[in-house]
Structure formats: structure tokens, C-alpha cells
């Protein structure tokens, strides 16, 4: 089993300006370093939790479809069926396609009606529809690929002239979908007005190419009065507060302690166990 990120995240869950506010940094001399530390903290958080923070598109490659073992009727019951495909990155947003090489070597795409996706699982599972089995794939490495989108949020920009938002990421929404927003800027930062990160909104229209209009829960159109405070700071979807708080603490520690070792100094290291505990509610494991 191997994975390839086809469309990487279009940004980071926390913005450089939020880190600077948290660290009381008033100039831009270290912006480049802070940006790299944010990326490192995000990668560490994703490694620890097996979560995808910002939306990305992944391709899982298998040598064959999973099948029941020959002793399956007598095997110990398991919460995960032996014939299930397990998607390593969570939370799952959408299975884009399942493709395989048939016995003639031709690439085939499965009909979504032939399989069931359990996105509520962490990690998500895919099994054949009841009464069906996985197709027979060519017995060679990499014969099966599953393309899927995972993550919590994507950055967006606002066009105040036509009242549209443009989302930068692989995930799409349908008319009527309920969405929430958050901003990365720390105290004083505001989403593009009149959006409120404590409220939910509806997708009113989806012309295409990541462009949408919004309405409130009563169906009233959202008319934007400003475009927000810079790009990469407003997100559709919400990355959990605990993960973002952990990232801020991790970036702060790496920024203040720039060396791997301290030479010639008496150093007392005090562990703060609650810090990594911020990630505990979000940790997942692969069977």
C-alpha cells in the first residue's frame, strides 16, 4: 500500500500573523522562518493524529482488492471487515474514484453504486455493496487505485462586487450544503463581513470552478461588505481548536528555542504534558 498526494493543501491552518500576535512579534524579519515552522508543526500534527487538516486529494494504491481470508467463516469477529478498503487520511470528504486494471490490462472505473463508503468511521472504510464482490484485478503491483479527498477546511477569497467566494482546494460543495467558517488572525481578526465563525450558512449557488454564493439559514443572500484582512486567513470548514492551539504552542517553542542542544548551560527541562494532550481527542490509528 502506498499513497500519493495529488493536490496538496492550499495553505496552512494558522497564518503567520496569528503566530506573530501570539509571540508578540511586531516586525516581519522572521516571517519566512515562522512560515516554515508552521508547516513543520502542521506536518507533525498530521503525523501524530493521522488527520488531514486542510483539504487535499490523495491517491491510495493497492496491489489487489482486499478479500476475506480462507478461514474467514471461523475467524474472530472484527470491527473492520476483512474485505474493506481503509483510507489512511481522515476526515474523509469524498471518494472521487476507484479504478483498477482488469485481466486484459485495461483501466476500469467502478460504478459508485457498486460500493459503500462509511465516511463516519475514522479511518473511513469502503466495502462492496451488499450482494456484490470486488472485481478481479490484474495480479500485478499497483493494479488498484482509490482517489479521495480528505480534510477539514480550505482557504477562500471574497469578491465583494458579485458577492461570491472562491475556494482554493479540491473539495466542492453542493447547493443547500451547510458550511461554517473560521479565520486565523488571533484576537481582533474578523472574517469577511458579515460572516460570523459561530454561525452556519448555506451554499446558495455553485457556478463552478470553486465559486459559490452563500445565504443564511433563512435563505437570505449574504452580501459581503469587505473582503477580509489578507489572503490565506479565512477558511471554509473548521480545523479543530485543539489542533490549532497545539500548533501555536509548538511553533512558539521552536521559535524561542532555535538550537537542538544547549552547550555549557545548566538547563532544567520542564515537561508540559497537557500540550500534547491537546491532540489526544483527535488521534486515529490504522489497524
What spans do the regions from the language model cover?
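Divalent metal-cofactor coordination and adjacent catalytic microenvironments
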Residues: 1-196, 204-287
Amino acid at each position: 500500500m502506498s499513497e500519493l498526494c495529488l493536490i496538496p493543501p492550499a495553505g496552512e491552518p494558522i497564518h503567520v500573523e496569528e503566530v506573530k500576535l501570539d509571540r508578540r512579534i511586531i516586525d516581519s524579519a522572521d516571517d519566512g522562518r515562522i512560515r516554515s515552522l508552521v508547516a513543520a508543526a502542521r506536518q507533525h500534527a498530521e503525523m501524530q493524529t493521522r488527520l488531514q487538516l486542510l483539504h487535499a486529494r490523495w491517491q491510495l494504491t493497492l496491489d489487489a482488492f482486499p478479500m476475506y481470508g480462507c478461514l474467514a467463516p471461523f475467524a474472530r469477529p472484527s470491527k473492520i471487515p476483512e474485505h474493506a478498503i481503509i483510507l489512511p487520511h481522515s476526515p474523509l470528504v469524498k471518494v472521487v474514484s476507484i479504478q483498477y486494471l482488469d485481466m486484459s490490462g485495461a483501466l476500469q472505473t467502478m460504478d459508485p453504486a457498486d460500493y459503500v463508503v462509511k465516511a463516519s468511521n475514522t479511518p473511513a472504510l469502503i466495502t462492496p455493496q451488499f450482494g456484490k464482490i470486488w472485481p478481479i484485478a490484474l495480479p500485478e503491483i499497483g493494479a488498484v487505485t482509490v482517489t479521495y479527498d480528505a480534510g477539514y477546511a480550505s482557504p477562500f477569497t471574497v469578491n465583494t462586487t458579485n458577492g461570491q467566494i472562491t475556494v482554493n482546494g479540491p473539495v466542492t460543495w453542493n447547493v443547500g450544503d451547510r458550511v461554517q467558517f473560521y479565520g486565523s488572525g488571533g484576537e481582533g481578526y474578523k472574517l469577511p463581513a458579515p460572516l460570523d465563525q459561530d454561525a452556519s450558512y448555506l451554499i446558495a449557488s455553485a457556478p463552478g470552478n470553486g465559486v459559490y454564493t452563500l445565504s443564511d439559514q433563512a435563505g437570505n443572500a449574504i452580501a459581503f461588505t469587505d473582503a477580509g484582512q489578507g489572503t490565506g486567513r479565512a477558511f471554509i470548514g473548521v480545523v479543530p481548536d485543539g489542533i490549532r492551539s497545539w500548533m501555536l504552542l509548538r511553533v512558539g517553542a521552536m521559535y524561542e528555542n532555535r538550537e537542538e542542544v544547549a552547550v555549557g548551560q545548566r538547563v532544567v527541562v520542564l515537561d508540559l504534558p497537557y500540550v500534547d494532550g491537546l491532540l489526544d481527542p483527535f488521534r486515529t490509528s490504522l489497524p
